[in-house]
Every structure is written in C-alpha cells, then in structure tokens.
C-alpha cells in the first residue's frame, strides 16, 4: 500500500515538473460545443446571422462573450484549422468592425487592433464589418456589408 502511494506521489511530482499536471488541473472548461485555446473559449456557429445579431447572440451566451477578436497568427491558425473541420467555403463573422464608417477598425471586445490579416480585397464601399474569408483557408479577412447573413465565431475568457 505504501509503495503504491509512493509511486502515485512520484508520478504526480513528475507531471508537475513537466507542466502536464498544470494543463490537466488548471485548464478551465468551455461551454459544451466550444473549444479551448490559450486561455479562451471559442464557439463556431453555422447559423446565418447579420453582424449585429451575431454579436447579440454571442453576448447571450454570457461569460463576457463577443464576436471573436483574433490577435495573432497562432490564434488565427488554430481557429482556421478548427473551422476547416466543419466547412471550407462560407465566410465567418468576427468581432472586427468600423463603427464610425471611417476605416477606423476596432474589436468589439475592446482588444487592441494590432494584428492584421486583410486580404487584397479587404475594404471599401459600404463594408464595415469583418469576416474570416474562406479564400486562403480562413487565414485572411475581408470587409463585408454588416447586414449580410452568415456564420459567426464567438469568444470568451473562462
């Protein structure tokens, strides 16, 4: 019995030193159907909503959820890989918008707008809401008319 307890203690000690235990114990859980990456939970919804309704639906999930801000290439790549497991052709609303309609883009969740991934046909006209474009496997963004109905991505920090 003492030997079994000692082995368990040794195993837990090894896991703690490698960081594996921290991932197992400290990792918060996301809502069912959402996925976890780097301290955030993401929900991909294949419902058709305009940008404003998509944002309202994200907020309805609580936990401070909004349409997703994408702040790095690593985050963009993880999201793109996840979405590609469901579909490869429909654009997806994200939380980037131009509320004053002056090409002054900002994230709806208040995150700093530093990382940019606009496609060549990114902005112009009456297009003041951003989408992840299915061209280039969801790694680039395009602007679109905010009243267009399409899939959307929500994000919150658990």
Curated annotation (Swiss-Prot):
InterPro entries: C-type_lectin-like (IPR001304), C-type_lectin-like/link_sf (IPR016186), C-type_lectin/snaclec_domain (IPR050111), C-type_lectin_CS (IPR018378), CTDL_fold (IPR016187). It is found in: Secreted. Disulfide bonds join 30-41, 58-154, 129-146. Highly expressed in the gastrointestinal tract including the duodenum, jejunum, ileum, ileocecum, appendix, descending colon, pancreas and small intestine. Weakly expressed in normal colon and stomach. Strongly expressed in most colorectal tumors than in normal colon. Preferentially expressed in mucinous tumors and in some cases neuro-endocrine tumors. Expressed in mucus-secreting cells and enterocyte-like cells. In small intestine expressed at the basal perinuclear zone of goblet cells. The keyword Secreted applies. Keywords: Disulfide bond, Glycoprotein, Lectin, Secreted, Signal. GO terms for molecular function: heparin binding; mannan binding; signaling receptor activity. Glycans are attached at residue 50. GO terms for cellular component: cytoplasm; extracellular region. This is Regenerating islet-derived protein 4. It comes from Homo sapiens. The gene is REG4.
């Amino acid at each position: 019995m003492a030997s079994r307890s000692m082995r368990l203690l040794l195993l837990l000690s090894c896991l703690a030193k490698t960081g594996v235990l921290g991932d197992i114990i400290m990792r918060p859980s996301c809502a069912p159907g959402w996925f976890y990456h780097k301290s955030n939970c993401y929900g991909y919804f294949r419902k058709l909503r305009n940008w404003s309704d998509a944002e309202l639906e994200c907020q309805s999930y609580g936990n401070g959820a909004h349409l997703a801000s994408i702040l790095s290439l690593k985050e963009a790549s993880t999201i793109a890989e996840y979405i590609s497991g469901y579909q490869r052709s429909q654009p997806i609303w994200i939380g980037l918008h131009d509320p004053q309609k002056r090409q002054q883009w900002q994230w709806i969740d208040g995150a700093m707008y530093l990382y940019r991934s606009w496609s060549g046909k990114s902005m112009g006209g009456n297009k003041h809401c951003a989408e992840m474009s299915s061209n280039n496997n969801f790694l680039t963004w395009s602007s679109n008319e905010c009243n267009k109905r399409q899939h959307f991505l929500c994000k919150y920090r658990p």
